[in-house]
C-alpha cells in the first residue's frame, strides 16, 4: 500500500476493485505509516471492495479502522509463517570461496555499508551486499542486484554475520540464527523494533 511505488495513488487492484471474485487483503503493509489527505479520502471507497482485511502494523490498523466498517486484524509478516526447517529446505548452496558478512542495505544507508565493512574486517570476512538499487559505482567488491527469492534467502542462511537496514533482513537473520546488526531505520524501523 505504499503509493510511492504506484504513481502516488493506491492501486485499485490491491483493494479488489474490478475483480469478479472475493477479495482479501492479507498482511498489507505501509512503511512509513502515514496517509496524505488525498489518500485518506480515497481509501474508504477502495476498502469497501474487500471481503476481509488484515495488515502487518498495529499503527496501520489504527490508522485505517476509522476509514472502514470492516474488522481490521493485525497479522504477522508472511515470512514468519514458515519455520526455520521449511525455509532451510528451500535454500540452495551459495557459491562463495570465503566466509562473508552479508549487507542487506535496502535503505541505501552509508552507515549500513560502513558497519558491514568494519564487521567484515573484524571477522576476516569479505562483504557481500544485496541491494535493489542500481549503483553506478560499487561500494564493495561484491554487490548483488538481481537475486531470485531462493538465492536471496540462501545468502542469509550461509552468511557469517548480517548487517541490515531492512525488516526482512532482520527476520531472516533471526530465522537462520545469525549474529546481526540492524542499522537505524528512523521512522521505518517500527516492525524491526517490534520483532526484536
Q: Which positions does each model-derived feature cover?
A:
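Aromatic- and Gly/Pro-rich donor/ligand-binding loops
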Residues: 1-45, 92
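Catalytic donor nucleotide-activated moiety binding site of glycosyltransferases and closely related
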Residues: 24-32, 63-64, 105-106, 111-148
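A conserved, positively charged/aromatic
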Residues: 44-48, 156
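A short beta-strand/loop micro-motif in the catalytic core of glycosyltransferases
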Residues: 50-57, 163
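Short hydrophobic/aromatic-enriched beta-strand-loop microsegments
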Residues: 70-78, 126-129, 179-186
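Donor nucleotide-activated moiety binding/catalytic core segment of transferases
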Residues: 72-80, 84, 132-133, 137-170
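Conserved donor-binding/catalytic core segment of Leloir-type glycosyltransferases
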Residues: 94-107
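Catalytic binding pocket for nucleotide-activated donors in carbohydrate/polymer assembly enzymes
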Residues: 171-196
Amino acid at each position: 500500500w505504499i503509493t510511492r511505488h504506484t504513481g502516488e495513488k493506491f492501486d485499485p487492484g490491491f483493494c479488489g476493485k474490478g475483480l469478479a471474485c472475493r477479495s482479501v487483503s492479507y498482511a498489507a503493509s505501509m512503511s512509513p505509516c502515514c496517509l496524505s489527505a488525498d489518500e485518506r479520502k480515497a481509501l474508504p471507497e477502495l476498502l469497501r471492495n474487500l471481503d476481509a482485511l488484515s495488515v502487518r502494523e498495529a499503527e496501520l490498523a489504527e490508522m485505517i479502522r476509522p476509514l472502514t466498517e470492516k474488522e481490521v486484524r493485525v497479522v504477522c509478516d508472511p515470512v514468519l509463517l514458515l519455520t526455520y526447517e521449511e525455509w532451510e529446505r528451500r535454500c540452495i548452496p551459495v557459491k562463495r570461496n570465503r566466509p562473508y558478512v552479508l549487507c542487506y542495505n535496502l535503505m541505501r544507508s552509508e552507515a549500513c555499508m560502513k558497519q558491514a565493512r568494519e564487521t567484515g574486517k573484524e571477522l576476516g570476512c569479505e562483504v557481500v551486499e544485496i541491494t535493489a538499487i542500481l549503483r553506478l559505482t560499487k561500494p564493495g567488491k561484491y554487490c548483488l542486484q538481481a537475486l531470485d527469492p531462493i538465492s536471496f534467502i540462501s545468502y542469509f542462511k550461509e552468511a557469517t554475520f548480517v548487517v541490515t537496514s531492512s525488516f526482512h533482513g532482520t527476520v531472516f537473520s533471526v530465522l537462520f540464527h545469525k549474529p546481526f546488526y540492524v542499522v537505524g531505520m528512523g521512522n521505518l524501523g517500527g516492525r524491526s523494533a517490534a520483532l526484536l
